[in-house]
Amino acid sequence: VGDIVREYERRHGNDYKYFAEENSIQLNDTHPVFAIPELIRVLKEKGVSYLSALKIAKQVFNYTNHTILPEALEHWAVRLLKKILPEISEILLSINSSARWRHRKEGYTPQESAATSIYIHSRRAFSMANTAVFVANKINGVAEIHSEIIKRDLFAAEYAHHPEKFENVTNGVTQRRWLELANPELSELIDKQIGRDWREHFEELGKLNAYTANEETLSEFIQVKGKKKEQLFRYIEKTEGVKIDGERILYAQVKRLHEYKRQLMTAFALLRLYYDLKDGKLKDFTPSVFLFGAKSAPSYFRAKGIIKYINEIIKLINADPETNGRLTGVFVTEYNVSYAEKIVA
């Protein structure tokens, strides 16, 4: 935040009337919401009044809620913040007062005021989600059904009075990274069929529907996917030391490690397959590879336990000569975007 302000001052000095036009700060969940009182604090240090700084903040910040789970709806104890960040604590109390004043002015019911309160009296804590919702210019979920949930349930009181603040922005990927860069062979095939405009106009890929029954195109597509799978297997052999031979079905689960994301369920399924193969219950089984890629939050000990558990299952399976010709497990090391490009291609 300090760097953003310094860069602005380099262009405009201490005239902050253009600040909101030139800067936009995205809050992904509530972890970075401290940027709101921090911006106000920095602007106040520069001589901007609290109300003017709050007005700027309301134009600069936008808030994305990714999940309604408590881990994404942080609360910070007032006693703790007063001890370690006294200025930030005072600014949050001021924002809470501003919110209460607006709620009275706009006729919020007592229930609505309680639901949107920044200072939660019963918990003696600040709600970072309600701070973001009050200040943010725009609020969005990351899928249509999720956006409806936050409007209907999570932030219903704010939505009832300020529906214009709420939008849906469906999570997605860019075709330039995840298709053109990650899979140049498939990009070349697509270019041959529909031209190159899909790089800038995503909807152009819809023209591929005309080729879903074209045997020649489908054959080339299968060849490309086979080539990319072979490239991935060779990369895994080089990076992980796990040799994968022959035609195998690839089951990949690559995402942040969390209990609700069901990696543990996949691990149970893998273990069940292993013991069924050992017992001779699966006579007609296509050789398969189960690939995991994930990281956990530093303090999420249960997630770390799941990672350890999955790796132990993989060690068991890959070391068994009875099954490792038909079933292989891989937990990739240092899973990142570059690795993901190879997996999804």
Locate the predicted segments by residue.
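A conserved ligand/cofactor-binding region detector
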Residues: 1-345
